[in-house]
Amino acid sequence: MRLLGAHRAALLVLACVVVVVIHGLGEAEALGGGGGFVRAQGTRFVLDGNPYYANGFNAYWLMLLAADPSQRGKVSAALGEAAGHGLTVARTWAFSDGGGGNALQLSPGNYNENTFKGLDFVLSEARKYGIKVILSLVDNYDSFGGRKQYVNWARAQGQGIGSDDEFFTNPVVKGFYKNHVKTVLTRKNTITGVAYRDDPTILAWELMNEPRCQSDLSGRTVQSWITEMAAHVKSIDRNHMLEVGLEGFYGASSPSRIAAVNPSGYQLGTDFIANNQVPGIDFATVHSYPDQWLSGKDDQAQLGFMGRWLDAHIADAQAVLRKPLLIAEFGKSWKDPGYSSGQRDALYGTVYAKIYESARRGGATVGGLFWQLLVPGMDSYRDGYEVVFGETPSTTGVITTNSRRLRFLSKAFARARQAQPARGKGRHNGGK
């Protein structure tokens, strides 16, 4: 009887939350924003008037493999398997800078059309499987060129640049980046015929994967860059949401959070609060890798940190930013000393529980993307964090359970919305 009572109480709470959320969705609908594009409305994602949860995965490699037609089957397999497990969002790169391999941008403004066609294929296949895509526009790191490559291009044109951090301030470098943004956003897909900026398959643009600027820990340099580039993106594309690509480290705007929440030594020139308050930034992101940030700590300490890290960001997204929060990267490596699949499952379970509880209460957390999804035959891409569904049954079960719970919430909100009378219409003039 106690369990039954608890179940009834939970349903009552959910019903109350549904009423509150549906009221907000009526306001969202009044503002427009259908047509298959996901919008940020308050602290929620909304798709055609209903709450939308970004339940998904990272697969940075999608464009790189799709650039080779003989490898496209792996892209299709990954998207198909993801959809089969209830995943709805993929995050991937729309960059690869420099002259090596399947680079996208060979030099400033000079693009490899075969690689661009690979990205066309990714978006076409994602649409086929009902998966939305977040496209990141440049990397902080140099594995795929990133800001170091941009700086080197500027040096080759005679710019006297000292540090790679001048990526954020040098006018020539910023011009290169703005040109790349415009090229990607205005690209017309050779398969679908739809310009990227008009394609609802794209969930959002990301300014940079994990921006950092250790030469200016005040955060002012990155803040200025975000402000300029957010305005640039929005001047080209008003259809899609935009996010920064932040890991979530707190900065000067919230000094108490630096000591209480940031892992020790992780103040890297970004500011979770200030950066996400920039006009044009539609939602906040956070990444979390306790096994890297707290290496040497035991599993319980890492799980405890994960809980505190997420709680702080969820609370701040709700009360301070008043914007949606996406947990855009999280994972645990099998290369960690003493690793067991149970440890990974516990970490995934912690993340998913935080997402579900926030979503169930109508809170700011709109989903999570694990790092990373692979399919068989991709051994060279294994980094320790990979999930291959057929090889990891327990973790796959955790992922699938989360998909099922979020799908239940989506359906509950959708049913409640359908049961609501049309806003602004009387009883007798709403049709049959």
Curated annotation (Swiss-Prot):
UniProt entry tagged with the keyword Secreted: yes
Keywords from the named record: Glycosidase, Hydrolase, Secreted, Signal
Cell compartments where the protein resides: Secreted
InterPro entries: Glyco_hydro_5, Glyco_hydro_5_CS, Glycoside_hydrolase_SF, MAN-like
EC number: 3.2.1.78
GO CC, any one term: extracellular region
Broad class of enzyme this protein falls into: hydrolase
Active site residues of this protein: E210, E329
Gene Ontology biological process terms from the UniProt entry: polysaccharide catabolic process
Main location: secreted
Stored Pfam families: Cellulase
Signal peptide range: 1-28
Similarity remark: Belongs to the glycosyl hydrolase 5 (cellulase A) family.
Protein name as catalogued: Mannan endo-1,4-beta-mannosidase 1
Species classification: Eukaryota, Viridiplantae, Streptophyta, Embryophyta, Tracheophyta
Gene name of the encoded protein: MAN1
